[in-house]
Regions:
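Surface-exposed peri-terminal alpha-helical interaction modules
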Residues: 1-211
């Protein structure tokens, strides 16, 4: 349903904008103020956020967005969660279901824009890699189907919002921690910066250079 999809994606984008705006509040904290209670966090880290991993899995990501993500074979986003825990089971279940991206491909296909059969039948538990044949279909869609194009652009809007969140997160951590190791043991700013240019819907970005 085109109109329902647009309404839901618009709401999701607005929620993402609200999340990004919260960083303004966190940035009122000075490095010394954060350091005064950082030890109490122990190894707690946003890296451990099952909800964020579940969000990424629902969208279509199957590996961490950071450096080396493309080297994996999928199903790795839940490895840091306690085996058998409700949080891990939720993330693993999301990674085993058709994602928003998979649903978008089927939506376009049903709208009369035939997607490659391999793209429609790919193993949803594995990471998606951008495909030129899919991008060719998306290019034709943008030129000939304004309504479907609006849905695709709404997906780009949300993906861009996720990128804004990542960027603001990186800069907040950099101004608060500098180059220190992250609370959860990651490389800190280095790890976060590596997540910046890994969109969830790569085909919708790559096709633009071919229009």
């Amino acid at each position: 349903d085109t109109h329902r999809s647009l309404a839901l994606l618009s709401r999701a984008r607005t929620i993402m904008k609200t999340c990004v705006a919260q960083i303004d509040v966190l940035e009122t904290m000075t490095p010394l103020q954060f350091a005064s209670f950082r030890a109490r966090l122990s190894s707690a880290s946003g890296f451990q956020s099952a909800q964020f991993r579940e969000l990424e899995a629902v969208l279509g990501r199957r590996d961490h967005a950071g450096a080396g993500a493309k080297e994996g074979s999928g199903m790795k986003m839940a490895e840091h969660l306690v085996p058998g825990s409700p949080a891990r089971l939720r993330v693993e279940a999301a990674m085993g279901r058709a994602s928003v991206w998979h649903s978008a491909l089927r939506y376009c296909h049903k709208r009369g824009h035939p997607m490659p059969q391999e793209a429609l039948e790919y193993d949803v538990s594995l990471p998606w890699e951008a495909r030129e044949d899919v991008q060719e279909v998306l290019i034709a869609l943008h030129r000939n189907d304004p309504e479907s194009s609006m849905v695709c652009e709404a997906l780009v809007d949300f993906d861009e919002g996720l990128g804004e969140w990542r960027y603001r997160h990186v800069k907040m951590v950099e101004r608060t921690l500098g180059k220190k190791i992250g609370s959860g043991g990651s490389s800190g700013v280095g790890y976060l910066a590596a997540t910046l240019f890994n969109p969830v819907f790569p085909d919708l970005w790559e096709m633009r250079s071919k229009l």
